[in-house]
């Protein structure tokens, strides 16, 4: 996007999702302190039948709201879904819990999150809040799916 036509108050959904996906992919390579090594991290959600490599992570943007402050300042709140897929013939619940713990650690360690907006300018988020962590509790064994719902304030 041409910087001369950039808006002062624009959404940064795509940039934030991309930065989260990049951090997860770079961090979750099996080296300490992380226990998971992911095969793929994508900056979009896919249908279940499209997942072929495990463990896999997909990051997608959801609802975005605004909070208006004085002097024309506004905060944006972006809800992010981090969906995790595992395949384990021994203990799928443990494999999924380890991956979800690693995802949570990456999100917390990168708060505030630095990202590049559509004009190429470096930006930072104000706050990352993990709202919920949910799993299928082994119903799909040997496959497992879990979600971390995050709110990004920027």
Per-range role (PLM):
Residues 1-49, 54-154:
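Charged, amphipathic alpha-helical segments and their flanking helix caps
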């Amino acid at each position: 996007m041409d910087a001369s036509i950039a808006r002062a108050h624009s959404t940064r959904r795509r940039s934030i999702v991309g930065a989260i996906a990049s951090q997860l992919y770079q961090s979750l390579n099996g080296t300490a302190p992380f226990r998971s090594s992911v095969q793929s991290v994508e900056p979009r959600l896919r249908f279940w039948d499209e997942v072929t490599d495990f463990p896999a992570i997909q990051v997608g943007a959801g609802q975005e709201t605004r909070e208006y402050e004085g002097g024309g300042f506004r905060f944006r709140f972006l809800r992010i879904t981090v969906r995790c897929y595992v395949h384990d013939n021994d203990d799928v619940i443990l494999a999924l819990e380890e991956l979800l713990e690693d995802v949570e650690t990456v999100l917390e360690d990168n708060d505030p999150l630095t990202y590049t907006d559509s004009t190429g300018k470096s930006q930072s988020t104000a706050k990352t809040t993990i709202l919920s962590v949910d799993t299928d509790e082994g119903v799909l064994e040997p496959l497992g799916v879990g979600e971390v719902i995050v709110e990004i304030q920027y």
